[in-house]
Design a protein with these regions (language model features):
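Glycine-rich FAD pyrophosphate-binding loop
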Residues: 52-72
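C-terminal catalytic lobe of FAD-dependent flavoproteins
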Residues: 314-430
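Active-site substrate-recognition segment that forms the wall
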Residues: 77, 117-125, 211-213, 228-363, ...
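Flavin (FAD/FMN) cofactor-binding and adjacent substrate-gating region
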Residues: 2-16, 83-89, 113-193
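Glycine-rich active-site loop/strand segments that organize a redox cofactor
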Residues: 72-103
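Extreme N-terminal leader/targeting segments of oxidoreductases
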Residues: 1-34, 52
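N-terminal Rossmann-like FAD-binding beta1-loop-alpha1 element of flavoenzymes
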Residues: 32-59
Length: 455
């Protein structure tokens, strides 16, 4: 892959974000103490924490830092998981689960701390994250989350319907869960800022250098690319959602453990000040409890950055614009005519039980999967934990225990069928207003069964 082959999506983030550091291709034979495959948030965070400990580290990136999921997402900084709550995590992992919950609790604060300490210009706004509930039955989700996260000292609050209306500027929701430490960033600016930071600290990033294979030679791992190779005493594979694109032949057990789900993002024209002040006036990040998720946040230019899902062939962009326009006008009639300046997509890495996983891939070799839509906050402390593992910290002290990869059965078929789950989600969303309790029970039964299958 050469520099001309790196094509960025037509995204808002690619349009407004300054270029990252100049990263050469990997050529010849190189060495480092630690080699990381993947230049997204996790790989960059791992490199950052290793360089803080003066470890010689090099990243091998297939395209450019932030090209994959890290630079394409909505940029919401969410210090929770998508489904499992603290009690679920502790029931699964015991004492390690308590450490993991503490890591999650602090994950958003950790991200904003890194941004401040290294003066990364990521358009960051720590105004909090709110999860409004879309049906009366779903208020139980917010109540449960507030109760469980409060036990661990998280700054969370249960919002009434009136409080939610005041916070979001819409009466479409029935209450909500609010975490004050959340917020949002320009994710590509964060990725490029992290890349610039780690290079400044002495790390090397080899771009446009897809890893073709790795093997154990003596006491070192050797990663081969088209034009060169690099060896290290330790190896970290941090490809996650794009494992199937760039690392399927490298670590098939990881590539088939994570399900890449296509996520569409959209950015409106900048809203006028008068309208902006009536729609999410406090500029919180918002994503609700719909199966077909409703989510939105502002960028630094007052564009409303949202998205949706679309099925089938044909003009997907046109149909998506029409569907999301109708949604925005229904939620916020005051928005008036809606025009989208940018529409793009990228993959989210999903595991069957909605939990992230760390793996040992061999002596001094590590990998992970499963951002499950929470990568922006999660990957910063996760990179720290991978760096600690590389440096020999015992597993009993890590925030996330190691586990064996658990593949999706019939992964290729499921990948084709997964988008059509949207039909089921839409049907449930429409029926929940009448039969909320029934569908709430079904949702958690599904989670329980997925957890049992992945053990």
């Amino acid at each position: 892959m050469n520099s001309n082959a790196v094509r960025w999506p037509n995204s808002l983030w690619a349009a407004v974000t300054p270029s990252g550091p100049d990263c050469p291709e990997l050529t010849g034979a190189q060495q480092a103490d630690v080699v990381i495959i993947g230049g997204g948030f996790t790989g960059l965070s791992t490199a950052l924490h290793l360089r803080e400990a003066s470890v010689d580290v090099a990243i091998v990136e297939a395209a450019e830092p932030g090209w994959g999921a890290s630079g394409r997402n909505n940029g919401q900084v969410i210090p929770t998981l998508s489904r499992p709550d603290p009690d679920d995590i502790i029931a699964r992992h015991g004492a390690a689960g308590e450490r993991f919950v503490a890591m999650l609790r602090d994950s958003a604060a950790d991200l904003f701390d890194v941004v401040r300490r290294y003066n990364i210009a990521a358009e960051q706004e720590q105004a909090g994250w709110v999860q409004p509930v879309h049906s009366p039955g779903r208020i139980r989700i917010a109540e449960r989350r507030v109760q469980q996260w409060s036990k661990f000292g998280a700054p969370v609050e249960l919002l009434s319907r009136d409080q939610t209306k005041d916070m979001l500027g819409s009466d479409a929701w029935y209450g909500g869960f609010w975490n004050r430490t959340g917020g949002h960033v320009n994710p590509l600016a964060l990725a490029r800022g992290l890349a610039r930071t780690v290079v400044g600290l002495g790390a090397r990033i080899y771009a446009r250098s897809p890893a073709l294979s790795f093997e154990r030679r003596g006491d070192r791992w050797v990663v081969k690319t088209e034009k060169g190779e690099i060896s290290g005493r330790s190896l970290v594979v941090a490809t996650n959602a794009y494992s199937g694109e760039f690392a399927k032949s490298l670590v098939p057990e990881i590539a088939t453990e994570v399900m890449p789900v296509l996520s569409w993002q959209m950015a409106t024209q900048p809203l006028s000040d008068n309208v902006r002040k009536t729609i999410i006036p406090g500029r919180q990040a918002m994503s609700d409890t719909h199966g077909e998720l409703y989510f939105a946040r502002y960028d630094a230019r007052n564009r409303l950055v949202t998205g949706g899902a679309v099925l089938g062939p044909g003009d997907k962009t046109g149909r998506l614009k029409a569907r999301v326009t109708e949604r925005l006008q229904r939620l916020w009639p005051q928005i008036g005519e809606v025009s989208f300046d940018y529409v793009w997509n990228g993959y989210v890495g999903m595991t069957a039980d909605f939990l992230p996983r760390m793996h040992r891939l061999g002596p001094n070799a590590y990998g992970w999967t499963g951002c499950n839509g929470r990568a922006v906050a999660l990957t910063i402390p996760l990179g720290r934990e991978l760096a600690r593992a590389v440096q020999g910290v015992p597993e009993s002290e890590l925030a996330l225990p190691f586990s064996e990869p658990v593949q999706y059965m019939a992964h290729g078929l499921l990948r084709k069928l997964a988008p059509w789950m949207l039909v089921l989600y839409r049907r449930r969303d429409a029926q929940e207003l009448v039969k909320g309790d029934r569908f709430e029970l079904l949702r958690w039964a599904e989670y329980f069964l997925a957890s049992r299958r992945s053990r």
